Amino acid sequence: MNNYAETELREGTLFSKKYNDYYSSKKDALSESTYVFLEKNNLIQRWLNLPENKDLFTIGEVGFGGGINFLNCCKKWLELDLKNKRLVYFATEKMPLKLDDMKILHGFYESLNAVSNQLLDTYPKLTEGFNLIELFNGKVQLCLIIDDAEIGFSQLIQSKQNSNTSYFESFDCWFLDGFSPNLNPSAWSSNLLEQVARLSSKHTTLSSFSAASKLQKTLAENGFNVSICKGFGGKRSMITASYKDNHNISPYVNPLGWHVEKYTPTRFKKKQNITIIGGGITGCLTAVALKKRGFNITILDQHGDVAIEASGNNRAVLYPRLSAHSSSLADLNMIALQFASNYYKKFWEEECGQQCGVLVLPKSNTEEKIFHNISLRYGRNENFFELLYNKTLKKIAGLNLSAECGLFFPTLGWLSIPKICKNLVKEFDIPIISSKADGLKFIASENSWEI
């Protein structure tokens, strides 16, 4: 990706050359973050009083910047040690900081070292669009959207349904923290704020350091009750807001297929027993994901062990399947590939394979053209993969090749699936029952299966 922010150090913090403004307050930025966003949204109290049937709290931020608000929330959330609850944090950033710049900025906040170190250690090669980062064993999930905020958040709007009937859980809280409206108007546009409203519900709150009259007016027009309060430090004022449940927003004009529109999410009770049939890589990863969310999990496998059949591959390549065409499936493949390269990093460190990179070669002239088009389409993501030619290609491969070009993915590699599966069930203490899944019976009255 080549749209990283141009920065320089000024007065003890990072300064944006493009927006001619500081990424954080020149003094006491952490206290400002706590005051403007945590305190004014009453987050600590809301987190402590989360209902038993609500397993996640979702924050949306416009303007991730150096991630100080995220780290501050992350630290406070972890200190509360809420069992089987997740903090899910969506943030947009059009021009992200380079990793080295992020390290410099975080270095000014020693109290955030523990959370900062984990973020920096798992910080992926960013790609345009959605970048999913899981921290602290799934207790915190960050979705960093590298795009204009209006474009990024619009992709979370499923259909004509509003957040109360859609299967997307509405945001609990919004942080509006882009560069000032005069310097970066797209981060405060009426179109963006309409999307913020569409992704909100009657329990949603919002805060911003800005108290601009246009911002107040636009929020009010989109269904928010807006209040002005004292700003942090020497700032005269800021705003807080809460969403009104009865506000009528215009229908969204990009509905999904009928089968998605009619979908109603199933609500599970916590501590429910779930049996995963099959102990392959998919079964093990699903079991772990559900275990992290507080369910009692058992794996049922006819061999009484994991990774015996198709997942018994000791040299499985994390293989990319990208497309030169723009589609939801192509975007999903890129997101999944980037997430997988980050997710398996831990296992590579445990010697369950090797992150040696993956080089994909074309099999025909047609595929060469496809590779070229893929490179053009994802041209901003050269840190994640690169189209190589001739001498460079030969140097990476370490041998002579007949192909004249190839797509190289430096963060991919090969994996020992049996080792990974065994490590997962051991780490998360997931029992395995040796049995075939005979006699499955659906109990309609209980919406469950009998094995």
Locations of the language-model features?
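A conserved short coil-to-beta-strand element within the FAD-binding core of flavoproteins
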Residues: 433-449
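Glycine-rich FAD pyrophosphate-binding loop
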Residues: 292-312
